Amino acid sequence: MARMYYDTDANLDLLAGKTIAIIGYGSQGHAHALNLKDSGINVIVGLYPGSKSAKKAEEAGLKVLSVAEAAQAADWIMILLPDEVQKAVYTHEIAPYLSEGKVLCFAHGFNIHFGQVVPPPTVDVVMIAPKGPGHLVRRTYEQGEGVPCLFAVYQDATGQARDRAMAYAKGIGGTRAGILETTFREETETDLFGEQVVLCGGLSALIKGGFETLVNAGYQPELAYFECLHEVKLIVDLIVEGGLAKMRDSISNTAEYGDLTRGPRIVTDETRAEMKKILREIQTGQFAREFVLENQSGKPGFTAMRRQEAEHPIEEVGKDLRAMFSWLKDK
């Protein structure tokens, strides 16, 4: 079993007297900034001119600067921007101010692992990655708890990089729940694999495939939506709470028997071979190169795929059905 580290393993004093710049104030950015602030750390926020998030950050009591100003003023710089914009922002607004001994932080290893960002050898480069969305990172912190985090060291220029990463994780509440040490390579490759094969790519393809099969067989689209999309949350909640065992213990015997006898016919040896192929594309950097080139060319293919997916019948059916769900109206 991997070792977990907790509050007593991390030294928050390493952040004392330091200024941490949070670059970006989205889902993760606001949670990191506010949690660190509430942990007694001096936090500033770096945003581009005209950012709609500036007012929110200022109303929360945070000092907002341009990205370049924040990078220049900070001892620690946490980049919480979309993967595809990090290289340009780093190159033009952060790199010129990375003086010796500073700490460059990430919450995902994509740009470091695939060589899009190449820091100077005189700075620590670390990763602190909460395994939950920003609103959960913030809410659990306020409740005196936390969200588990991954942490990693890519470059240790000061001899303190590992301790510094753990201190940051403590500052955002991660060590209350437990933090797990990894590497930039492992985090990046497993994260991309999970997104593509299971959580996003695999699940959305499975949902659409099931929906289309029922509709093409003459069943009402609304029933197909309920059975193949809506009830996914009911099952996933059980799995998150207690693993596959709790899910199977909570469903009917009919459903469990169907799971055990028919499920393996969906994920076949051919499917597993494709999973291995996708993993290899991630490991070799093929996916990263494809994604970077797509963004550099203005995202024509990405935009077309988004448009095509938005026009899928499941979206129209879902929109009408969700209007009936009173528990969603407040959201």
UniProtKB/Swiss-Prot annotation:
GO cellular component term of the entry, any: cytosol
Needed co-factor(s): Mg(2+)
Annotated disulfide bonds: none
The name this protein goes by in its record: Ketol-acid reductoisomerase (NADP(+))
GO function term, MF aspect, one: ketol-acid reductoisomerase activity
Pathway(s) this gene product operates in, as recorded in its UniProt entry: Amino-acid biosynthesis; L-isoleucine biosynthesis; L-isoleucine from 2-oxobutanoate: step 2/4; Amino-acid biosynthesis; L-valine biosynthesis; L-valine from pyruvate: step 2/4
Biological process (GO), any one: L-valine biosynthetic process
Enzyme class, broadest EC rank: oxidoreductase
Function: Involved in the biosynthesis of branched-chain amino acids (BCAA). Catalyzes an alkyl-migration followed by a ketol-acid reduction of (S)-2-acetolactate (S2AL) to yield (R)-2,3-dihydroxy-isovalerate. In the isomerase reaction, S2AL is rearranged via a Mg-dependent methyl migration to produce 3-hydroxy-3-methyl-2-ketobutyrate (HMKB). In the reductase reaction, this 2-ketoacid undergoes a metal-dependent reduction by NADPH to yield (R)-2,3-dihydroxy-isovalerate.
The organism's taxonomic lineage, starting at the top: Bacteria, Bacillati, Cyanobacteriota, Cyanophyceae, Oscillatoriophycideae
Domain KARI N-terminal Rossmann: 2-182
Domain KARI C-terminal knotted per the UniProt entry, residue ranges: 183-328
Residues reported in the UniProt entry to bind Mg(2+) 2: 191, 227, 231
Keyword terms: Amino-acid biosynthesis, Branched-chain amino acid biosynthesis, Magnesium, Metal-binding, NADP, Oxidoreductase
Ribosomal protein as UniProt keyword: no
Catalytic residues identified in the record: 108
EC identifiers of the protein: 1.1.1.86
Residues that coordinate or bind substrate: 252
Pfam families cross-referenced by the UniProt entry: KARI_C, KARI_N
Residues given in the record as NADP(+) binding sites: 25-28, 51, 53, 83-86, 134
Annotated family: Belongs to the ketol-acid reductoisomerase family.
SUPFAM superfamilies per record: 6-phosphogluconate dehydrogenase C-terminal domain-like, NAD(P)-binding Rossmann-fold domains
HAMAP family, sorted: IlvC (MF_00435)
Catalytic reactions on record: (2R)-2,3-dihydroxy-3-methylbutanoate + NADP(+) = (2S)-2-acetolactate + NADPH + H(+); (2R,3R)-2,3-dihydroxy-3-methylpentanoate + NADP(+) = (S)-2-ethyl-2-hydroxy-3-oxobutanoate + NADPH + H(+)
Cofactor mode of binding and number, as noted: Binds 2 magnesium ions per subunit.
